[in-house]
């Protein structure tokens, strides 16, 4: 073949290859631009958090709220119910302008992390975290995003490192505290059991709020003539043996809002009944299950106030980072007459009957 013709053919082939490559590259750039444009769409809800992130989940004109609940038991379910009610009072109603994605971790921190990361991946407008572990995990997942976290059912946000000593936020997170009315609880137990000396408390070592509650109980107990006997567990599997052990050392048990122990409350109540040792609860649902009495909060109300806070954040009326967490001063006396009678105890006047 003539060398000059050969060189011309090679040059022509190279030119065609470059032309095709250029066209392919242009097509790819157009696809990338189109994809970026879609992912950058914003909600029409007017949410400040959505506007700032520019890429959060929407469903038509609805805002999307992810509710992560660490465990499933009465008080936490009541918080969730109240939260949705509070959102409605703030103008966000399911089926109208609100979509809720609810996930329960089953008291598993690994699953809780998956839930939080899933909310981030879906780019929800706001995360509601129920309990301390869920709030800590959710805040950690959302910290580098514009997604606000609003928590509830947290005993001590400061100890959980979600708030500062003055109640202000450490970041794009706020919520409500269900701090126990410890002195009122001890006063109630003293009225019901005037001769009691030792109160037992079971708690899980992985829940920082529980450790703080036990510490506060131990500090306040002497004022009411009590000594607190504590028994730690590391998981729900430890609860049966731990309950057997502590019941031999105390006059009664006082159950706090420890998720691990509350999840095993039926076991605790059964063993306590056989031992003839009454159990006092920390909120209404525990009393319904068989605890004698409690100076506790109405968790539907706690959740409702949390929902109202979340609605303000979604509307852009406030930023989670600028809102101090809320606490509740008032506590009601709930009593289970049937449980009290089974131990030969008399409930104080003015209690609210919440038996089964």
Say what each PLM segment does.
Residues 23-55:
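Bacterial lipoprotein signal-peptidase II cleavage site
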Residues 104-164, 258-277:
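Beta-alpha junction/loop-to-helix N-cap segments that form part of ligand/metal-binding clefts
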Residues 137, 142-182, 281-293:
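Flexible loop/hinge segments that line or gate small-molecule binding clefts
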Residues 58-59, 156-198, 297-318:
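Hydrophobic alpha-helical segments within soluble ligand-binding/sensing domains
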Residues 99-121, 232-246:
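Structural motif
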Residues 312-356:
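Hinge/cleft segment of the Venus flytrap/periplasmic-binding protein
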């Amino acid at each position: 073949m003539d060398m000059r013709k050969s060189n011309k053919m090679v040059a022509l082939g190279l030119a065609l290859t470059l032309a095709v490559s250029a066209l392919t590259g242009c097509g790819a750039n157009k696809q990338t631009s189109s994809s970026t444009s879609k992912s950058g769409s914003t909600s029409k809800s007017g949410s400040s958090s959505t506007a700032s992130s520019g890429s959060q989940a929407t469903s038509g004109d609805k805002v999307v709220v992810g509710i992560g609940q660490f465990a499933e038991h009465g008080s936490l379910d009541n918080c969730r119910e109240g939260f949705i009610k509070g959102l409605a009072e703030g103008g966000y109603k399911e089926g109208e302008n609100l979509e809720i994605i609810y996930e329960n971790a089953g008291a598993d921190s690994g699953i809780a992390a998956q839930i939080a990361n899933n909310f981030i991946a879906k780019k929800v407008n706001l995360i509601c975290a129920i309990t301390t572990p869920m709030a800590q995990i959710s805040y950690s997942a959302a910290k580098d995003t514009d997604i606000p976290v609003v928590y509830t059912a947290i005993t001590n946000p400061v100890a959980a490192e979600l708030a500062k000593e003055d109640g202000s936020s450490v970041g794009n997170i706020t919520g409500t505290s269900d701090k126990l009315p410890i002195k009122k609880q001890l006063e109630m137990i003293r009225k019901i059991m005037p001769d009691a000396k030792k109160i037992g408390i079971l708690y899980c070592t992985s829940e920082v709020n529980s450790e703080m509650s036990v510490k506060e109980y131990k500090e306040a107990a002497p004022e009411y003539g009590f000594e607190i006997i504590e028994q730690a567990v590391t998981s729900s599997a430890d609860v049966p043996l731990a309950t057997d052990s502590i019941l031999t050392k105390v006059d009664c048990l006082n159950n706090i809002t420890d998720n691990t122990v509350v999840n095993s409350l039926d076991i605790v109540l059964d063993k306590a009944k056989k031992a003839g040792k009454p159990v006092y609860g920390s909120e209404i649902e525990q009393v319904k299950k068989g605890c004698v009495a409690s100076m506790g909060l109405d968790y539907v109300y706690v959740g409702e106030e949390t929902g109202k806070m979340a609605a303000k954040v979604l509307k852009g009326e406030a930023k989670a980072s600028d809102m101090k967490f809320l606490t509740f001063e008032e506590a009601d006396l709930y009593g289970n007459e049937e449980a009290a009678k089974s131990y030969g105890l008399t409930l104080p006047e003015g209690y609210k009957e919440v038996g089964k």
